[in-house]
Design a protein with these regions (language model features):
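Membrane-interface micro-motifs in multi-pass membrane enzymes
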Residues: 85-88, 93-100, 140-148
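Transmembrane alpha-helices of multi-pass inner-membrane enzymes
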Residues: 107, 124-131, 140-169
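Long extracytoplasmic/lumenal interhelical loops at the membrane interface
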Residues: 27-51, 55-96
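Hydrophobic transmembrane alpha-helices and their immediate junctions
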Residues: 74-75, 81, 95-128
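Active-site/binding-pocket entry motifs
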Residues: 20-23, 68-73, 157
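Short helix-capping/hinge motifs at transmembrane helix termini and TM-loop junctions
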Residues: 136-137
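Flexible juxtamembrane loops connecting transmembrane helices in multi-pass membrane enzymes
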Residues: 1-40
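Short acidic/histidine-centered micro-motifs embedded in hydrophobic/aromatic stretches
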Residues: 17, 61-65, 111
């Protein structure tokens, strides 16, 4: 039955995730494991940010900074898994520094506070989706991510017609 299949798949994924975490905490290799590789990416990004807090490494030097930091840390990640931060906020701080990260956060959150009184369900749904994406991916580092964000952010911010929300809900 379909319910048993879904339940068993959820249990399998949960067991795999728990094994991944336990293996990683015990000093195991994170290579090929989505969740624990992100821990490695984030730790590496934080180390880079500590060394280049004010100005970052520059947008062109991000791959080199990560490669160098993985080598310095003797990371157990296989070379093909030594990726960037997979977090938009860390990506901004690595490339441009903490002051730019603060500006990015202000610019990102400003429309939310400005627009919250209008009660736009669609805008807030879009914004939360984009924000959550930025926590686990460097969303704005790809053409698809930039296009998605700019298109829908502009659409919902400049479209002052509340009928869209009323008709949607």
């Amino acid at each position: 039955n379909a319910d048993e299949l879904i339940e068993s798949n959820i249990h399998i994924r949960l067991r795999v995730t728990l094994w991944e975490l336990n293996n990683y905490r015990s000093g195991g290799n994170a290579s090929g494991h989505s969740l624990t590789m992100r821990f490695e990416f984030w730790q590496t990004a934080l180390q880079i940010i500590k060394q280049h807090a004010l100005t970052g490494v520059g947008t062109g030097d991000v791959p080199d900074a990560f490669a160098k930091k993985y080598d310095e840390a003797n990371s157990m990640l296989e070379t093909k898994f030594r990726l960037r931060s997979h977090n938009q906020f860390l990506a901004v701080a690595v490339a441009l520094g903490i002051p730019a990260l603060l500006l990015f956060i202000i610019v990102l959150f400003y429309p939310v506070f400005q627009y919250q009184n209008s009660g736009s369900f669609l805008y807030m749904t879009f914004w939360v989706t984009a924000f959550l994406s930025m926590l686990t991916e460097d969303t704005l580092e790809t053409q698809a991510g930039v296009s998605f964000f700019i298109f829908f952010n502009s659409l919902f911010l400049f479209l002052k017609n509340k009928e869209l929300d009323k008709n949607f809900i």
